[in-house]
Swiss-Prot record:
Keyword Cell inner membrane belongs to the record: yes
Protein name: NADH-quinone oxidoreductase subunit D
GO MF: NAD binding; NADH:ubiquinone reductase (non-electrogenic) activity; quinone binding
Organism: Dechloromonas aromatica (strain RCB)
Cross-referenced Pfam families: Complex1_49kDa
Keyword annotations from UniProtKB, A to Z: Cell inner membrane, Cell membrane, Membrane, NAD, Quinone, Translocase, Transport, Ubiquinone
Compartments, as annotated in UniProt: Cell inner membrane
Family label: Belongs to the complex I 49 kDa subunit family.
Lineage: Bacteria, Pseudomonadati, Pseudomonadota, Betaproteobacteria, Rhodocyclales
Membrane topology qualifier: Peripheral membrane protein
Enzyme nomenclature, EC number: 7.1.1.-
GO CC annotations, alphabetized: plasma membrane
Amino acid sequence: MADIRNFTLNFGPQHPAAHGVLRLVLELDGEVVQRADPHIGLLHRATEKLAETRTWVQSVPYMDRLDYVSMMCNEHAYCLATEKLLGIEVPERGKYIRVMFDEVTRILNHLLWIGCHALDVGAMTMALYTFREREDLMDVYEAVSGARMHAAYYRPGGVYRDLPDRMPQYQESTWTNAKKAAEKNENRSGSVLDFLEDFTNRFPTYHSEYHTLLTDNRIWKQRLVNVGVVTPERALQMGFTGAMLRGSGIAWDLRKKQPYAAYDKINFDVPVGVNGDSYDRYLVRMEEMIQSNNIIKQCIAWLRKNPGPVITDNNKVAPPPRENMKTNMEELIHHFKLFTEGIHVPAGEAYAAVEHPKGEFGIYFVSDGANKPYRMKIRAPGFVHLAGLDEMSRGHMIADVVTIIGSQDIVFGEIDR
């Protein structure tokens, strides 16, 4: 009699629930997963190697393209590592702006995550709600940087410029009539801070709508509860960070344990799960959005009262203000040298990590004293989480693999890099 062999199934890379270009080779016994083998590298763009041929500032836009839904958090880790090597301090206002945009980015990431996760599981409506809120936050990105996604707003030493005192207005066009444009501009008459404050006041109402749709939904709970359980011990052994670790009951958050920027002056709670399953990870990320909303409110209140510089005044690191550069020969020379030759960073090595929406995102630099990094290494949280997919999927059905991938919140820009 012939041996019974397990069935092998290719999941992706074109599958909509694969969250990018994941190719997952599943070994199945009927519909039960015996082994899950992730194949990565389909989005590899050699970011670490490219950084070796670019100046320290030129590599900032590459960071946006790693995890392309958590753009400014990637930039933050890069700038922190560069500043550590340079031994410079960011002005206080620059720190608060960074914290505020880190949290805007966290909400942006979690909105996309819950919209797509629900869509994968079969709850179609969620994505329509979350993309409505993402639009407002992307307008804030656009107001400060000119780009909706790849902002390149952070710089070694601070941020590119201070917050604008007026929001861009919608204009009448082929797609938007005068009435529609006026409706969209209702809360855009003030500054970026006014617009963002209005959003933070509205967001808890939207958030409660998400809870109404999903949290006690019988089908949602059946699909998530006791699926992809990770014990606290295993989560630590596998190197999980972020919501993947906190969902298993371990209160590890770099913003609390190793504060950077202005997080040591901000009040917020770290939500943790109990059971370590997909449902707990969902609840942790949902609560994180509310905590981020509160952090943004605190930053807005501080920024209103404390004007000041947003980037270091060391012209060997940051360019002088444009108006000075046009009237002062010395500052023109600084500007010219910075944009032709770049910063010369002292020889040494440094590692800096931030509490990224997906976990601990770290940048490790080795500098040989030149105007380019000798070596850059990216510590991507999603890479570690994807490595745990095999263990998390075993014994579950094929449909549960979709749930587990969704609860990991993986993006291939940072995994393949």
